[in-house]
Amino acid sequence: MPVLEPRAVIDTNEARCRDCYRCVRVCPVKAIRVVHGQASVDARRCLGCGTCVRECPQGAKRYRRDLPKAEALLKTRKFVAASLAPAFAGAFEPWALLRLPAALRRLGFHYVAETAVGAAWVAQASAGLARERKAPLICTACPAAVGYVEKYRPELVPRLLPLVSPMMAHARHVKARFGAEAGFVFIGSCVAKKAEAERPELAGLVDCVLTFEELADWLRDQGIDLGHCEESAFDEVPSGSARLFPVEGGSLATAGLASGPQDLGAAALSGFEALRDGLGMGQEGGVQLIEPLMCSHGCINGPGIRSEENIFDRRLRVLRFSQAPKSGPEAAATRADLSARYQACPPSPAMAFSEEQIRQVLEQTGKGRPENQLNCGACGYASCRDQVLAVLSGMAEREMCIPYMRRMAEQRSSLIMETSPNGIVILDRDLSILNANTAFEKLVHASSLSGQPISQYVDPDPFEQVASGQVALYDAPCRDEARGLSARLIAYPLPNEDRLAGIFVALPEPGEDARQLRRLKDETVLQARELQEQQVEMARQFANYLGQHTARGEQLVKKLIKAVESEAGPAEGSLGRP
């Protein structure tokens, strides 16, 4: 089966990405690549779980919106079905649940049913297969969990149930019942479903995947208020307990393999940590079936739900709805094919790095010694070694290490302080010297100043004014002939540090200002006299030239008139003059 390049379902709004690395910390498989401080999702590694979307404090991570695709489908297909995932009972208010079918029909859908219809069929098939196998089988309803096994736990692929998810089961049912040209739109809380719909072997079954958030936006844009919609029955409703699928243990209860925590025939895992640790369990206690859900507490906590409700309130809504009378005809057993195939597809060939390569990067970040490897996790990785491996594989940057960047900042600060030609001194609130650069030591003709009161070297009054809050910034000349000090002092408090800073800019020695001013005046007078002489000489030469030019011109005109008169004589018809 060919493995195609995956289409990204999650991307990054770079304008909002702020170097917090939270997405790196929460991503269960570290599918976030950081380049020049910008975090982006590597589609080959991504599970589409949407954890980064839900957790990003700046809203920089976003999943792909497919509303235009759904709208186009309604315009181009004669028949389009809407499949509503069972988590809708937790995503919407109880009074709105039976109004959703009418709202979806107003949007243009011809068939509206619960995806739990397909969940019931998958659960029944799962129970039958689980009883025939010795090793525990893994449910395949959660596409993020399936993707994790295929990409990162390939040894467990044989344990995956060879069954499609409820979404795909329902899609096959609709296509079989209404024809292959029927459109099928799935609406749920899961972002990973968008990627599942594009699996090559399942292409064409699900035409579009929307989240509950997208549905809410669509209804708002079309001016459809659920409060103004009538209650209406679904075209098909599920049998049994299939409405429990979106909560932890729901699929197992539907399959009849677990009715409570005392049952040992199945294991429900929700949240990545439980999923990671529990998928490889053996036959201990007679476990036949493992239900993995990537989102903690199940699909009612998916990233596509826009709800302020407490997660336990959502769960309670689902439980109550599962016990409510069914509103619509119950779906019969399907004749659609429920089989599926899964295969290992690691995101990329494993990259091996030598211990020397790892050691070099550790040393570059100041963590060459084991005691300097803090394993603080601020960068998003569990250990310094994991971060180094990510750096070497091109997924991370050295600058993501917060302790390393702090040391770099301190070193730059120290370098600036030591190379500054101005005297710089840092004081505590008691006006004792914490740090002073070489330029300040030269200014006060002393060394080894740390711990000494500033009053031993300069007048402390400016610093006392700043420390007491009398002035926020002191900026004035500071002269002390007895100490040989001549400088301009700029003193100010350091925010959030409870410290004071003083910068001494050297001034000319007393009397030097007057000497410089006198020298400048003398030079100015001299230059003015030279300019005056040049201007007078230029004027004289110009006048002389102009006079010579005028005299020569006058002589030339007289000669010209005389020549014309001597040659022409009196003109014809003219009156003679005496």
What are the language-model segments listed below?
Residues 440-450:
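PAS/PAS-like sensory domain cap-loop motif
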